[in-house]
């Protein structure tokens, strides 16, 4: 085990990680505070005691929808009737102290109720909205979280990751990219927004041609940049695998197979986005 010990020592030298985690009305926890050191940690307990809920809470310190991809409203602890009457805060929250390169940061995220007008039904509706704060300052872009902490997870539901559809694999790869490219989360979010917009334009049946072309051009530019970032991550992994041979498992070489990915073999991303 000396090789493993050496690698763990190298990781902990950087002194980066979660040193305090506080949950409020999160899943099965009314309140929870965990103090931790910068070291590998194993969480144990009975089935259903909330081990995965702690991991999910940590995953919300990174960009995205967490390791379960749950709806915001589903995360809040179900209150008993006697608490529901007295409860004035309808949301959940996760707060953490982060130590990164020997500097401390405060990260908080949670939900609050907001209201918007439904013009079709002529009424005001409330909805859950996620807010994020870094060092007590509210931020508008979740991608900012990537500057302070990155996380990768493999859950039992991902056991057939390489046997199922391509979308889960792309999502998993994108989360790996986030650790090296802070702008990648913003690019993927913008692409998904444009895709929904593009779909609605086509669905309407009376699309403005210039508007459609503009959206498609933006999607092409973002798509090429996303593919290029994924290729760079794959290249990093292949380099690591080549320099860290394993005596137990066979060697592997990773590749991305797709039209844009093949075009990037011979063309820069800027030109591919304009193709």
List each model region and its residues.
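A short acidic, often aromatic-flanked loop/helix-cap motif at beta-alpha or helix-coil junctions
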Residues: 42, 115, 159-160, 259-264
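Pre-Walker A-like glycine/lysine-rich segment at the N-terminus of P-loop NTPase domains
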Residues: 1-60, 80-81
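Nucleotide-state sensing region of NTPase/ATPase domains
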Residues: 65-168, 174-180, 184, 242
